[in-house]
Amino acid sequence: MKEKILHVVSSACYRGTLKQAFYGMGIEDEVIYLPVDFSCNYIPKDFSDAELMLAVMSIGTDLLTLHDKEKILSELKTFVTTDYSSYDKVYVWHGGSANDLLLLYLMSILTDDNLYHIDITSCAKFMKKQNPWPYVDMGCVCPDDIKTFSMLSLAKKVMGTEKTEYIGQWNRWKASTKPYRFSSAETGIIEEYPADFMDDTIIKYAKEGRVLGALMAKVFQEYYNLFISTSIILKRIRELYREHKLDLTVSIRKK
């Protein structure tokens, strides 16, 4: 009988990458994604409805409609209550980003003896054109890379002390008191950051009269090695604006 295999990634975008690659490779395995980025949002202390709602609400109430909140909450509840023991193998795809690693730690809690992980970091040296650092995240992977670098062959079973360590890491980070958790592309180690850690950079570039897109691009370049997404930067810009710490009436570019 054919094995029942599930692949898990940390974002909808990465799910699309795997689905496209698998289509070309004739693979029909199921692929799911974690609907909340725990590197920059509240990590639930348990999987109760109240805690899961806190995670969803932390995404930013001004960025979500009521429909969005209900949809994400439903997806998150499904994610943490799925019977993963019904699969022969559960593959977690990850790189060195905090979001990827936190997914791996979470899946160590949710699975039994069927968890495997595919660490794409070993392919980093082949993807220098996309990322100059030792660690990469799933965002560096395109569909062709999955076949070219035989990434499925990188799968390793998570067991024993390794799984215990990952569970310990999840318990550690869910107790984090700071809002951001990012890992360095140079070390692959997660550290926590305060809410205002990039405020000075945002305000500095905003004062140059940059339009919003250019402002986000400059801030992104400053923190690229922490795998920070533009959505995180936009969220903080909006928070600063609401707190009257940032003037978003930026000037029109000069021709």
Q: Positions of the model-derived regions?
A:
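A structured, charge-rich N-terminal accessory region that forms the first stable segment of a protein
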Residues: 1-68
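A general structural motif
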Residues: 2-4, 28, 85-89, 112
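A short acidic (Asp/Glu
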Residues: 16-21, 43-44, 99-107, 127-131
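Short, surface-exposed basic-aromatic patches at helix termini and helix-loop junctions that form
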Residues: 23-26, 84, 104-114
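Long, hydrophobic/aromatic-enriched structural stretches that serve as scaffold segments
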Residues: 61-104
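Short, conserved secondary-structure transition motifs
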Residues: 119-137
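A conserved mid-domain beta-alpha-beta active-site/ligand-binding segment of alpha/beta enzyme cores
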Residues: 132-210
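C-terminal, charge/polar-rich interaction regions
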Residues: 175-255
